[in-house]
Amino acid sequence: MTEFSHFYQWIVNNPFEIWLNTLPSQLTAWRLSVLKNPKAKAWLNTVQGLPELLPSYLNLLDRIQADISPPISESLQKGIENRLKALMPWRKGPFSLYGIHIDSEWRSNCKWKRILPHLDSLVGKKVLDVGCANGYHLWRMLGAGARLAIGVEPMPLFFFQFMAVKKLLGEALKAQILPLRIENIAPVEAFDTVFSMGVLYHRRSPLDHLYQLKNQLRSSGQLVLETLVIDGNDQQVLIPEKEYAKMRNVYFIPSVSLLNVFLKKCGFIDVRLVDVTATSTDEQRRTCWMTSESLLDFLDPEDHSKTIEGYPAPFRAILTAYKP
């Protein structure tokens, strides 16, 4: 598959090379399956229709911004913008690409700002982001100095959004999304840092997820875990009966104390809570790039401390831990 040709070259002669035994057939099967969907075919055509641009200015450290001198023509800019809008909704961002500002639903830079002070240095490191959505944070990881940033994300639209951005930032940049689930990827125990952000509460078995993350880390590697939490002691967890904030696939929202117990149960050490933040409408909101319901629609209109179902409104915790 041409979408992964660079990636296959990157993982030769390093611990990830064992993936070459399984990934090519897995990704070929994924492509054949996903392109049976007319929407996915349209997304692929949209990405293929984008020009390959090499920016003369690229900032991945403070934001994701690409520009070129002299600037692209107004007609080319409009054509790119129309193609990017054909990949809506954009839930993660923002991106500034040749004068086009993708104002995504989530201001993912806010999360990155909270996480960054607590990271081990990423300079020259190999990092994995599990459930990476459209790869926004992969680019920020490269900006922080990572040598290789790999994301795992099974949702097709997110993959095509990533490929669109990659085409506009530069194909040689060492970031890649694998459109698979983490349980379908062989453990390599080789990543310096593994991220799981906004995933744990979607998993029916949170302990299995933590073990999957651990099995990708090298010894002494850092785990960064960001997830929904509730107040309570080390025995308290919220299991929504039907929906949480209009999401059907939320299974498990633990207290911070219980999350700490889980991490230690799975063998992680030096577990630290580094941030707890209430999700705000400044960070998650409806925009012209994501026009359907957003956080404000998920909260009780009379009491924003509760979801529409009456549960505690979203609070997100960030914990770090290490594999022995």
Curated annotation (Swiss-Prot):
<dbReference type="InterPro" id="IPR029063">
    <property type="entry name" value="SAM-dependent_MTases_sf"/>
</dbReference>
<dbReference type="Pfam" id="PF08003">
    <property type="entry name" value="Methyltransf_9"/>
</dbReference>
<feature type="binding site">
    <location>
        <position position="316"/>
    </location>
    <ligand>
        <name>carboxy-S-adenosyl-L-methionine</name>
    </ligand>
</feature>
<keyword id="KW-0808">Transferase</keyword>
<comment type="function">
    <text>Catalyzes carboxymethyl transfer from carboxy-S-adenosyl-L-methionine (Cx-SAM) to 5-hydroxyuridine (ho5U) to form 5-carboxymethoxyuridine (cmo5U) at position 34 in tRNAs.</text>
</comment>
<dbReference type="InterPro" id="IPR010017">
    <property type="entry name" value="CmoB"/>
</dbReference>
<comment type="similarity">
    <text>Belongs to the class I-like SAM-binding methyltransferase superfamily. CmoB family.</text>
</comment>
<feature type="binding site">
    <location>
        <position position="92"/>
    </location>
    <ligand>
        <name>carboxy-S-adenosyl-L-methionine</name>
    </ligand>
</feature>
<feature type="binding site">
    <location>
        <position position="106"/>
    </location>
    <ligand>
        <name>carboxy-S-adenosyl-L-methionine</name>
    </ligand>
</feature>
<feature type="binding site">
    <location>
        <position position="111"/>
    </location>
    <ligand>
        <name>carboxy-S-adenosyl-L-methionine</name>
    </ligand>
</feature>
<feature type="binding site">
    <location>
        <position position="197"/>
    </location>
    <ligand>
        <name>carboxy-S-adenosyl-L-methionine</name>
    </ligand>
</feature>
<protein>
    <recommendedName>
        <fullName>tRNA U34 carboxymethyltransferase</fullName>
        <ecNumber>2.5.1.-</ecNumber>
    </recommendedName>
</protein>
<dbReference type="GO" id="GO:0002098">
    <property type="term" value="P:tRNA wobble uridine modification"/>
</dbReference>
<feature type="binding site">
    <location>
        <begin position="182"/>
        <end position="183"/>
    </location>
    <ligand>
        <name>carboxy-S-adenosyl-L-methionine</name>
    </ligand>
</feature>
<feature type="binding site">
    <location>
        <position position="131"/>
    </location>
    <ligand>
        <name>carboxy-S-adenosyl-L-methionine</name>
    </ligand>
</feature>
<keyword id="KW-0819">tRNA processing</keyword>
<comment type="subunit">
    <text>Homotetramer.</text>
</comment>
<feature type="binding site">
    <location>
        <position position="201"/>
    </location>
    <ligand>
        <name>carboxy-S-adenosyl-L-methionine</name>
    </ligand>
</feature>
<dbReference type="GO" id="GO:0016765">
    <property type="term" value="F:transferase activity, transferring alkyl or aryl (other than methyl) groups"/>
</dbReference>
<dbReference type="InterPro" id="IPR027555">
    <property type="entry name" value="Mo5U34_MeTrfas-like"/>
</dbReference>
